[in-house]
From Swiss-Prot:
It comes from Homo sapiens. This is Putative uncharacterized protein FLJ45721. It comes from the Eukaryota.
Amino acid sequence: MCMNTSIHAHTYARTHTHSVFMSSNVTVFQWMRLMRASSRSFTQAIPAGQLLQTACSHLFTTQNTCQNALGNNTRLQHTEKVRLSIGLADFGLPGIARNTFVVPDSISRYCREGSVIGKCCPSRKSALLNKQGSLKKFKITRGETQPGVTISVLELAEIDQRF
């Protein structure tokens, strides 16, 4: 099991690809069905009670600025409104976009909450390569879905390199 780190992580960007929000009652299975049903042209925010997300007109184009279809929803103030994540094929869930991915809590087998993958889990580095082949570092954050059920978001972060 990977140990927690005290490395401070900052959100990588505020308008770079798309954001993922979690509601209080979306299950991993609902998320999987949603991902399978999603397409490149998916541009609608999912209704409250399901996964809440930012709508982007071109999810595969990271240069596009994403518009928050939820507006200033005060219900989401407890959640960071920018959450960038990347697809990890070996965890078995498809993503809305190639560079967006939410995984079940089973990822905690590899890194605990707050850990930085690739630093604490060197064996997982091969899954964390970006399009240019360089390693990105990710911080695990968790969101409650139903009692006893959580999903993890791999958050693209700027990591303080002073380990």
